[in-house]
């Protein structure tokens, strides 16, 4: 792989940057992005030999076809909607109970739905709160399209669900049956396993410890976190509950150290990290930041580091997660990783860490302002302090408590 990267016509970071403009030109139908892509192509042919630039153009054509195909598929899916649904398979880790309101994501005939239901009794509420295995619901309900953007600059719920592969919502009127089922689908089984971990934490740990534990270990923040969510949002540090490279690094390094102590060789360990990464990604709900970080870790195992590592990660994400850069989480995750790659230097001590933290916080500011239109100045200092507290103290302690429980 390293030899292929060295022999490539242009630096990989140039290629990923070029494809990013093409990506937004197609998925967002942006004339500005298309103009930027054409301008970069002209610069490419000016700066590099025509033979090298021609190879890059062919690669752009292949990725462009892939982007157009994915965009067409999504367009077709949004037009060919289901007329009715009688049975839905529940994805357990998406279950949320808020008062007498139940919501979850479900599958039926290869389609995904966001499902809502008004609970009829306290017994029914407790049953869904404790539900961990895969179940299929027989129901009578009404399908509808999600709400779009209500006002200028407001949250577009329809666009968000589209990035998750969901084009319709289902409001259940009556539940006719609830049947436990089995499945060979890895994603569904990991969803069930994650739900079991969440329910275990909720039933064995007090509040607010359980919120910290589910948030930092599993990337799951439930409805009972809302009051704390408002507090952390006002302080500008709610993003610390989003799983990041620090958590991924902690668990990956812990997994490697454990297996090395058991006597495994580095070569065998390298290949065992692949199934571990899949399981860990599933236990965190296939979070955008976790998948990005895991890809970078796996590529680093094969000697791909620095900007080449970041660029190759972006190329892989274009293929395996075409909607990655259409979400705020995906963009912010890659922006953090890019700034960290560009600014990380050999240095030790508090001064180096403080400097790096300040650069990252200021570097990400334009993107945070674009997506959320707000910024708390003191969040830079609080992020620096609390990131150490969360990742170096809370994360190890909560992990130990969870394992011992």
Q: Where would I find each of the regions flagged by the language model?
A:
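N-terminal leader/targeting segments
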Residues: 1-79, 292
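Membrane-interface helix/helix-cap signal primarily in integral membrane proteins
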Residues: 2, 61-239
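Functional transmembrane helices that form membrane-embedded active or gating regions
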Residues: 2-13, 349-362, 381-385, 405
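Membrane-helix interface and helix-disruption motif detector
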Residues: 5, 22-34, 325, 350, ...
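Alpha-helical transmembrane segments of polytopic membrane proteins
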Residues: 30-42, 332-333, 383-391
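Hydrophobic alpha-helical transmembrane segments in multi-pass membrane proteins
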Residues: 39-60, 170, 228-380
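Membrane-interface amphipathic/re-entrant loop segments adjacent to transmembrane helices
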Residues: 188, 234, 370-385, 396-405
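Transmembrane alpha-helical segments that form the membrane-embedded catalytic/substrate-channel core
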Residues: 361-366, 392-399
């Amino acid at each position: 792989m390293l030899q292929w990267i060295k022999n490539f016509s242009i630096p990989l970071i140039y290629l990923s940057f070029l494809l990013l403009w093409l990506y937004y030109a197609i998925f967002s139908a942006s004339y500005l992005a298309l103009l930027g892509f054409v301008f970069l192509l002209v610069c490419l042919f000016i700066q590099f030999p025509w033979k090298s630039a021609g190879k890059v153009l062919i690669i752009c054509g292949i990725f462009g076809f892939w982007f157009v195909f994915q965009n067409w598929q999504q367009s077709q899916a949004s037009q060919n909607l289901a007329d009715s649904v009688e049975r839905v398979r529940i994805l357990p880790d998406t279950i949320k109970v808020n008062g007498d309101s139940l919501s979850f994501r479900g599958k039926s005939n290869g389609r995904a739905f966001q499902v809502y239901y008004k609970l009829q009794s306290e017994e029914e509420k407790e049953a869904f709160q404790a539900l961990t295995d895969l179940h299929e619901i027989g129901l009578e309900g009404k399908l509808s399209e999600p709400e779009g953007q209500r006002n200028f600059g407001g949250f577009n719920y329809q666009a968000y669900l589209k990035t998750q592969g969901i084009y319709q919502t289902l409001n259940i009127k009556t539940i006719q049956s609830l049947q436990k089922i089995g499945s060979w689908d890895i994603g569904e089984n990991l969803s069930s396993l994650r739900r079991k971990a969440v329910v275990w934490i909720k039933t064995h740990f007090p509040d607010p410890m359980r919120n910290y534990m589910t948030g930092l270990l599993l990337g799951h923040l439930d409805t009972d976190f809302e009051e704390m969510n408002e507090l952390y949002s006002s302080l500008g540090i709610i993003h610390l509950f989003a799983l990041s490279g620090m958590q991924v690094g902690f668990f990956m390094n812990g997994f490697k150290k454990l297996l090395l102590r058991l006597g495994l060789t580095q070569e065998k360990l390298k290949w065992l990290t692949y199934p571990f990464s899949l399981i860990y990604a599933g236990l965190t709900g296939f979070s955008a930041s976790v998948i990005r970080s895991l890809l970078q870790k796996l590529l680093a195992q094969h000697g791909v580091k620095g900007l080449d590592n970041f660029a190759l990660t972006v190329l892989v994400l274009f293929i395996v997660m075409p909607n990655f850069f259409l979400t705020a989480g995906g963009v912010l995750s890659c922006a953090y990783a890019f700034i960290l790659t560009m600014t990380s230097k050999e240095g030790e001590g508090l001064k180096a860490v403080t400097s790096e933290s300040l650069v990252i916080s200021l570097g990400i500011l334009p993107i945070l302002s674009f997506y959320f239109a707000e910024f708390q100045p003191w969040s830079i200092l609080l992020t620096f302090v609390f990131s150490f507290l969360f990742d170096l103290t809370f994360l190890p302690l909560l992990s130990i408590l969870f394992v011992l429980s």
